[in-house]
Design a protein with these regions (language model features):
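Conserved PLP-binding active-site segment in aminotransferase class I/II-type PLP enzymes
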Residues: 1-72, 76-77, 97-98
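PLP-dependent aminotransferase-like
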Residues: 71-105
């Protein structure tokens, strides 16, 4: 089979938006607004609109997002959360952070 379709070709995916990405990254690094700040607020507003949602909250990591999601669902001590063992460890961390027990299936 001489012609294989690449499983993952990040350079091809980025090529069409590279100049825009470089400009936004440079602006963000120059004004150090990569945590909170006006760019984050604008992203949250735009993404909420795009999703048809009233609100959007950006997080610094998937761990933080999972942790807050579990808190908002009132998951806590004594609860069990069904998860998969085939995931990043942050999934289990977030469950443990709220005092719940991960149950792997």
């Amino acid at each position: 089979m001489p012609d294989k379709v690449p499983y993952f070709d990040l350079p091809a995916q980025i090529r069409s938006v590279r100049k825009d990405l470089d400009a936004v990254i440079a602006k963000t690094l120059d004004n150090t607004s990569f945590c909170l700040g006006p760019d984050t607020a604008q992203f949250e507003k735009d993404f909420a609109k795009y999703c048809g949602a009233e609100h959007c909250a950006g997080f610094n990591s998937g761990t933080s997002a999972l942790h807050v999601a579990l808190m908002l669902l009132n998951v806590g001590r004594g609860d069990e959360v069904i998860s998969t063992p085939h995931t990043f460890v942050a999934t289990s961390w977030a469950i443990s952070y709220v005092g719940a027990k991960p149950v792997y299936v």
